[in-house]
A protein has these predicted regions:
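Hydrophobic membrane-insertion alpha-helices, especially the h-region
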Residues: 7-24
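PDZ/PDZ-like peptide-tail recognition elements
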Residues: 34-49, 55-64, 84-137, 199-221, ...
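Terminal peptide-recognition signature
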Residues: 117, 142, 149-152, 181, ...
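PDZ-domain C-terminal substructure recognizer with occasional recognition of PDZ-binding tails
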Residues: 120, 167-211, 313-330, 334-337, ...
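Conserved PDZ fold ligand-binding element
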Residues: 142-165, 281-282, 289-298
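Glycine- and Gly-Pro-enriched alpha-helical subdomains that act as flexible
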Residues: 248, 269-300
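Catalytic-site beta-strand/loop segments enriched in glycine and acidic/polar residues
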Residues: 253-276
Length: 368
């Protein structure tokens, strides 16, 4: 009888655990991801592929937390729970979030190419093609009229090439005013009419049509660059992409025989910006045996990448050198000063402070 009772209890616990695995929660769980050699992802035509060391791109594993994962996340080192609204835009689905992350990844690649080629003094051209619609907002004028992937090229006859251009044209409009939008959809040019609405003060208070926009552009370089990172999303690989591109463009091996990991958004001007999940990325790099880790420097109130990276490196007893940087130029300068030997320094190494513009704190697309 006792054995049967224990068997029934065990079966009930098993069923409860299985059910808990499928019960959703309003949280995402973040875990240390991978530290991937950037050489596997980047190819500069005719570039110098000889590297005695490696540049490593670090990632964070992000998944929707079930009830069971929620319970165990607190016990697993490196795991953290993030409320759904911290990652997703209002009304944004998980699929739309992944699409946004892919767009930010593309932007990071393009910025990395531009910044690296400009630093090396090599030819690079940027062609601005218009404003792509990532998605339409529920209950707004664009819903059911515009579609994800549409490319807006004019508004009331004004050429539109970038998101700031679209915003400037809209600033001269009034709530309720009807506007004519010229766009491309699957190879066909279309004209649509929409009425403008005013966003709430918390959303900027401007008038708009209810889309999440991104500037669409094409980059042309000589030599050509191919980046294949379809399985990775987000904007934070910009710095490491640029370092690898630069390493292949020039004859000097910037790796210095070291495993060099890092993270950071990168503007086309070469400015490094803040990112998310830095603790998990430091742990992923340490697990891969990296010698040093480039991290966005903390400059403005609210910046925390440098502080968190240094703290987690101490906490896990990492021998990696944490190197905060403000720009691609500063990161390259740091590497050029290194000798070709294993890093032998403590966790923290702060280069000279350089001025730079405000970094991108969080990759969240504004609505128009």
């Amino acid at each position: 009888m006792i054995r049967r009772r224990w068997g029934t209890l065990g079966f009930a616990v098993l069923l409860l655990a299985i059910a808990a695995w499928f019960i959703p929660t309003p949280y995402f769980v973040l875990r240390p991801g991978t530290a991937v050699p950037v050489l596997q992802l980047v190819n500069v035509a005719g570039g110098d592929l000889r590297e005695k060391g490696q540049f490593l791109l670090t990632t964070v594993s992000v998944s929707e937390a079930s009830a069971l994962q929620y319970l165990f996340a607190w016990m697993i080192p490196g795991s953290s729970l993030v409320p759904r609204e911290k990652l997703l835009e209002p009304g944004e689905s998980s699929d739309a979030y992944r699409l946004r992350q892919r767009e930010w990844m593309l932007l990071s690649q393009q910025n990395a190419i531009i910044a690296a080629f400009r630093y090396a003094g090599r030819p690079v051209e940027e062609f601005l093609l218009g404003v792509k619609v990532l998605r339409t907002l529920s209950g707004m004028p664009a819903e059911g009229v515009l579609a994800s992937g549409d490319r807006i090229v004019a508004l009331d006859g004004h050429p539109i090439r970038t998101v700031p251009q679209l915003l400037r044209v809209l600033e001269g409009k009034r709530e309720g005013e009807s506007v004519r939008i010229s766009l491309w959809r699957k190879g066909r040019k279309l004209e649509k009419r929409l009425s403008l609405v005013r966003f709430s003060r918390s959303e900027g208070g401007h008038v708009g049509i209810g889309i999440v926009p991104v500037t669409e552009r094409r980059i042309q370089t000589d030599p050509q660059v191919r980046i294949q990172a379809d399985h990775i999303g987000g904007p934070s690989a910009g710095l490491m992409f640029a370092l690898e591109i630069l390493n292949q463009l020039t004859s000097e091996d910037l790796t210095r025989g070291l495993k060099i990991a890092g993270t950071g958004t990168l503007s086309a001007e070469g400015e490094v910006g803040q990112i998310g999940g830095v603790e998990q990325k430091v742990m992923a790099a340490d697990r891969e045996g990296a010698d040093l880790f480039f991290v966005p420097a903390d400059v403005h109130p609210g910046d925390s990448n440098q502080f968190k990276a240094e703290a987690v490196a101490r906490e896990i007893g990492s021998r990696m050198k944490i190197v905060p940087v403000h720009s691609l130029e500063e990161a390259v300068g740091y590497l050029k000063r290194l000798k070709e030997e294993r890093a032998k320094v403590s966790n923290i190494d702060t280069p000279a402070n350089l001025a730079y513009n405000n970094p991108v704190l969080v990759a969240r697309a504004g609505a128009l």
